[in-house]
Regions:
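A generic structural signal for short beta-strands and their flanking turns/coil linkers
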Residues: 19-21, 31-33, 78-84, 95, ...
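HotDog/MaoC-like acyl-thioester-processing domains
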Residues: 2, 90-94, 98-100, 104-135
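Non-catalytic linker/capping segments at the edges of enzyme domains
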Residues: 1-36, 40-42
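Hydrophobic alpha-helical segments of small multi-pass membrane proteins
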Residues: 53, 57-61, 83-88, 115-118, ...
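Hydrophobic beta-strand-centered segment that forms part of the acyl-chain substrate-binding groove
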Residues: 50, 66-98, 103
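Hot-dog-fold acyl-thioester-processing enzymes
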Residues: 38-64
Length: 135
C-alpha cells in the first residue's frame, strides 16, 4: 500500500474538479503542499476578479494535500474536510494563484492546516484554516 503522500500525488492530477479548474500540485511532502490555479475567465465574478468560491476550493484542496503529505500508509484511504474558514484580504484580479498548505497540528484522525493563497505577484489574497478528518 502506498503512503499518503504517494496517494495525494496521484489524486490531485486525476481529480475531475482539479482538472476542470486547472489546479496543479507542484510540491508535496513533510506536512506541506503547494498548488497552483491558472487564471481563467470562467472563474471571475465581476470584471476580472476571481470568484471567492474558486479561491476557497484552491485553499481547501491545498489543506487536503498538506494533510496527506506524510509517510503514513493508511488502512483506509479516505477522508474529508471537517471545517474551512477563509479570510479574503485582497481581490485576485486576472492572476494565476498559488496556495501553500501547511499542517499546524496533526492528530490521529484530525489534521489542522493553515493555507495562504497568493497572486502571481506574491500579494496575499486569502488566509484560511482547515481541519481535515481522515477515514
Amino acid at each position: 500500500m502506498p503512503t499518503r503522500t504517494a496517494i495525494i500525488a496521484q489524486f490531485v492530477p486525476n481529480s475531475p474538479l482539479c482538472q476542470h479548474l486547472g489546479i496543479a500540485l507542484t510540491e508535496v511532502g513533510n506536512d506541506r503542499a503547494v498548488l497552483t490555479m491558472p487564471f481563467k475567465p470562467e472563474l471571475v465574478t465581476l470584471g476580472q476578479t476571481v470568484h471567492g468560491g474558486a479561491i476557497a476550493t484552491l485553499a481547501d484542496t491545498a489543506a487536503m494535500a498538506a494533510a496527506w503529505a506524510d509517510d503514513v500508509v493508511p488502512e483506509k484511504p479516505g477522508g474529508s474536510t471537517a471545517s474551512l474558514t477563509v479570510d479574503y484580504v485582497a481581490p485576485a484580479n486576472a492572476s494565476d494563484l498559488t496556495a501553500v498548505g501547511q499542517v499546524i497540528r496533526r492528530g490521529k484522525r484530525l489534521c489542522a492546516c493553515e493555507i495562504t493563497v497568493s497572486d502571481a505577484g506574491g500579494q496575499v489574497i486569502a488566509k484560511a484554516l482547515a481541519t481535515y478528518s481522515f477515514a
